[in-house]
Each structure stands twice: as C-alpha cells, then as structure tokens.
C-alpha cells in the first residue's frame, strides 16, 4: 500500500480539519497517494458496479495471508474514499475483512451525512465488493 496513515491517524487528521471543504481536500489527497494501478488491472473483473464513476479494485493475498488492495477511479473524491476504505482494511486477512464493520469508523468521521446519495451508494458498493471477494478468499 502507498504511504497512507493508519486508522487512528486517519481519524485524528480528519477531525483536525476545520470544515468539510478541508475534509474533502484531505480525502482527495489520500486518493492521490494511492499507488498507480496497472493498466491491465482496469478490466471488467475488477470493475465495481454500483458506482457512477469508473472504479477498479484489485485484491491479492500476500504470502502471509494478508489482503493487499489496489484501486483506481476516474473521480478524485471517489479515489479518496477508496483510500479511506483501504486504510480501514489495511493489514487484514480475508476473514478479518469479512467480519470488520467499517460503519463505526464512518460515523466517527461523520462521513455518511456529508456525502451525496450517489457517493454513499458508490462507497457501499466498494465495501460490498471487497467483502464479497474476501469471503471467496477466506
């Protein structure tokens, strides 16, 4: 994974933002930190359906059984939200991902109430897709 903060630092940084404009800019910055996705990984198998933007997420299990996530989107805010999700699932096994509830983290960040309905649906689609694929790997 690219140089991203851990869960606790993400929450600290997010709460230090003075307003929602700063928070959106921080989310976009997180997306910019994601590693470049290989062009051949932008394929139908990795496409996340249910997002208005184009979104691709690749999951691989490393030698230690930890899931490594990579992704990309054609929308900066969506790519940033993807980075937030990747931070929350960082260093987890497939089974950990299946059982981990991201919603309390989103509540702490007050994220859901500040996203448009289409962004919220896209975020949910990303989470559902990651959890579904993790279930097949666990």
Curated annotation (Swiss-Prot):
It comes from the Bacteria. PANTHER family: CYSTEINE DESULFURATION PROTEIN SUFE, SULFUR ACCEPTOR PROTEIN CSDE. It is found in: Cytoplasm. Participates in cysteine desulfuration mediated by SufS. Cysteine desulfuration mobilizes sulfur from L-cysteine to yield L-alanine and constitutes an essential step in sulfur metabolism for biosynthesis of a variety of sulfur-containing biomolecules. Functions as a sulfur acceptor for SufS, by mediating the direct transfer of the sulfur atom from the S-sulfanylcysteine of SufS, an intermediate product of cysteine desulfuration process. The gene is sufE. NCBIfam families: PRK09296.1 (NF006792). Homodimer. Interacts with SufS. SUPFAM superfamilies: SufE/NifU (SSF82649). One of its GO terms (biological process) is sulfur compound metabolic process. Keywords: Cytoplasm. Pfam families: SufE. InterPro entries: Cysteine_desulfuration_SufE, Fe-S_metab-assoc_dom. Pathway: Cofactor biosynthesis; iron-sulfur cluster biosynthesis. Belongs to the SufE family. One of its GO terms (cellular component) is cytoplasm. This is Cysteine desulfuration protein SufE. The active site is at residue 51.
């Amino acid at each position: 994974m690219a140089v991203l903060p851990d869960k606790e630092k993400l929450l600290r940084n997010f709460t230090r933002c003075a307003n929602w404009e700063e928070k959106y800019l921080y989310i976009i910055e997180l997306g910019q930190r994601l590693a470049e996705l290989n062009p051949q990984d932008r394929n139908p198998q990795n496409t996340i359906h249910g997002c208005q933007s184009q979104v691709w997420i690749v999951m691989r299990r490393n030698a230690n059984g930890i899931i490594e996530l990579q992704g990309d989107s054609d929308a900066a805010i969506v790519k940033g939200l993807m980075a937030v999700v990747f931070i929350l699932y960082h260093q987890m096994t497939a089974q950990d991902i299946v059982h981990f509830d991201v919603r309390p983290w989103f509540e702490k960040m007050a994220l859901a109430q500040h996203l448009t309905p289409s962004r919220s649906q896209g975020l949910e689609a990303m989470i559902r897709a990651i959890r579904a694929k993790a279930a097949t790997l666990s």
